[in-house]
Amino acid sequence: MSAQKPGLHPRNRHQHRYDLAALCQTTPELTSFLIRTPAGEQSVDFANPQAVKALNKALLAHFYAVTHWDIPPGFLCPPVPGRADYIHHLADLLGETTGSIPAQATILDVGVGANCIYPLIGVHEYGWRFTGSEVSDAAMSSAQAIIQANTGLSRAIRLRRQKDPAAIFTGIIHKNEFYDATLCNPPFHDSAAAARAGSERKRRNLGQNKDDALNFGGQQQELWCEGGEVAFIKKMIAESQSFRRQVLWFTTLVSRGENLPPLYRALTEAGAVKVVKKEMAQGQKQSRFIAWTFMDDDQRRRFITRKR
């Protein structure tokens, strides 16, 4: 059980193979989804979306003190280790200005989702406070139910409905509000057809049937938007200029390395003062996020001092 997962952040709690016995003790329902691999090892039936959901429930309970967690069918069921990596690398970025990770950081999660995953991890690991924006009523209701079902989370996480689906920060960041960072897992595909094709590939790779693939495959707003990831992030970059003095670092995941050059050009045109890329890896899966700020070193230090 001690084999390490290559590439995870040093503070990530998921460095080693899952201790399934401990997880099943925390969340007994996971027991019914355990299988034996051809090599004779015990594992989770990853081809079964209900098994993946039960695993997530167990991980969140065991490592992050989230005792009640659920998502409706049709919404994304996120891999916890990869989501935790984003939070830990973001913590490092926020710590670079002063030399220590801030304990009172305020974070905006753009598209918090039905799973509320980033705030759940960030609150437990660093004591941060989160605002989560969401365009979907169903996703927002699910996230709110998670917050209300877990003691203490309502003081640390608040949700705001994005009433304009074409907007990202506008209508969410209020006047005289300040954030240490924004984070986002943007829509990946550029059309519903591309999203379906991607889900079909994933289904075949996992050996799922079509009904299973639909179970937690993701909603439209989670999977695709007009122009895909690049268009969405370009919109985010353009909008971020209006909040350049209210947010220290704007950040977003970028799924494909080939999407970076047009985004770097957009950041230059927008007048970003500093741009950072953080590479992440989980096993064979490579990912990254980019971060940009409109403040120089002195302005960033003053922002932190004033905000604290």
From Swiss-Prot:
Enzyme class: transferase
Record-level Gene Ontology MF annotations: 23S rRNA (adenine(1618)-N(6))-methyltransferase activity
One Pfam family, short name: Methyltransf_10
Entry's EC annotation: 2.1.1.181
GO biological process, one term: rRNA base methylation
Location of this chain's protein in the cell: Cytoplasm
Domain of life: Bacteria
Entry annotated with the keyword Transferase: yes
Keywords: Cytoplasm, Methyltransferase, rRNA processing, S-adenosyl-L-methionine, Transferase
Cellular component, GO annotation: cytoplasm
UniProt catalytic activity: adenosine(1618) in 23S rRNA + S-adenosyl-L-methionine = N(6)-methyladenosine(1618) in 23S rRNA + S-adenosyl-L-homocysteine + H(+)
Role of this protein: Specifically methylates the adenine in position 1618 of 23S rRNA.
Family in the record: Belongs to the methyltransferase superfamily. METTL16/RlmF family.
Official protein name in the record: Ribosomal RNA large subunit methyltransferase F
Organism annotation: Salmonella typhimurium (strain LT2 / SGSC1412 / ATCC 700720)
